[in-house]
Amino acid sequence: MYPAYPYRGYRRECEQVGLTFPPQHQERQPGLEYLMDPPPLAENPAVRGSGRLAGKAALITGGDSGIGRAVALAFAREGADVAISYLNEHKDAAETRRRVEAQGRGSLVLPADLRMESECARTVGRVMDRFERLDILVCNHAVQYVQPSILDIGADQLSDTFQTNILSYFYLIQAALPGMERGSAIITTTSITAYQ
């Protein structure tokens, strides 16, 4: 099996070098990173921080695993205090927290269903209460239900996807923006699924 294909010819290149590993697809949303074998790499130990984010506070949604965990660890390495939100992946979130704190940074781990506007406001409020600032908001959480055809997408799936991947980003930004100072950053992410 191969990972999702980031570009044409990727699978052929993997086969040429004998690169294979077990399937990483999980039926549940969100997935559980601790079940993946081999586990994804979230940081490069050869990279040293330079303190570029010292004194800053960041909120990374979906920060328990994947891209979110990698961002959380990179920001901590650069000196930021890091808050992560996640839905229900408690074990993954605890591991991210452990790794952020191992870098000597403050951390906050917040379970939240960000499909609800009130949860977005509560999450941002908790970050402001803990760190007394929010300099970087990374909207990274998402669901991805890959379907072969638009005809296979039901109303519930469509609604859940829009609530999670679009409306919640709006709610988070709306909650965070009044407390963010000039020069702060709002970042949104996507994954390879957008290109399949």
Where are these regions (language model features)?
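Amphipathic alpha-helical dimer-interface segment in Rossmann-like NAD(P)H-dependent oxidoreductases
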Residues: 73-74, 125, 129, 164-184, ...
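Non-catalytic terminal and boundary segments that flank Rossmann-like NAD(P)-dependent oxidoreductase
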Residues: 1-54, 183
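Conserved mid-core segment of classical short-chain dehydrogenase/reductases
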Residues: 6, 20-21, 116, 121, ...
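Conserved glycine-rich Rossmann-like NAD(P)H-binding loop of the short-chain dehydrogenase/reductase
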Residues: 80-95
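Catalytic Tyr-X3-Lys loop
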Residues: 151-170, 187
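Canonical Rossmann dinucleotide-binding motif of NAD(H)/NADP(H)-dependent dehydrogenases/reductases
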Residues: 51-83
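Catalytic loop of short-chain dehydrogenase/reductase
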Residues: 142-143, 185-196
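Rossmann-fold scaffold of SDR-type NAD(P)-dependent oxidoreductases
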Residues: 61, 134-142, 165, 188
